[in-house]
């Protein structure tokens, strides 16, 4: 019984690592599914701009940091009504060279997606 108590106690004290400041700027890769196809994106982010490279397509978005682990992106040159909507990104966990995050259109809490970005520079 004491052993079970200790396991539960230590498990409840575990906090996922979140060194978000290490991933505020840099060059990253993110792989996701789009229309049943795997797409690899490379993006470069500084404190205020995110430049996303997908194939030969380049998208630029402004970045507004809410706190160390959360930011809002807005495309600077949206080509559709959907692209005009801001995207909220929250870093959930970090490790040595990557972070896991969730993202959604601002205000759409029902359709959150998750992904992992790897820092390459």
Annotate the PLM regions.
Residues 1-6:
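Sec-dependent signal peptide recognition
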Residues 9-12:
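C-terminal motif of bacterial Sec signal peptides marking the signal peptidase cleavage site
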Residues 14-16:
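Bacterial signal peptide processing site
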Residues 62-70, 91-98, 119-121:
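A short, structured loop/turn motif at beta-sheet edges
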Residues 73-96:
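An anionic, turn-rich surface loop/hairpin at beta-sheet edges
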């Amino acid at each position: 019984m004491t052993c079970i108590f200790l396991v539960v106690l230590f498990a409840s004290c575990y906090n996922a690592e979140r060194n978000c400041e290490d991933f505020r700027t840099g060059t990253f890769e993110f792989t996701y599914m789009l229309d049943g196809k795997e797409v690899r994106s490379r993006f470069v982010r500084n404190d205020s701009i995110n430049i996303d490279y997908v194939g030969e397509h380049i998208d630029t978005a402004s970045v507004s940091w809410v706190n160390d682990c959360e930011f809002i992106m807005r495309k600077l040159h949206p080509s559709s009504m959907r692209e005009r909507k801001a995207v909220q990104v929250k870093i959930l966990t970090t490790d040595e060279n990557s972070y896991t995050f969730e993202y959604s259109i601002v205000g759409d809490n029902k359709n959150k997606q998750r992904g992992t970005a790897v820092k390459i520079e």
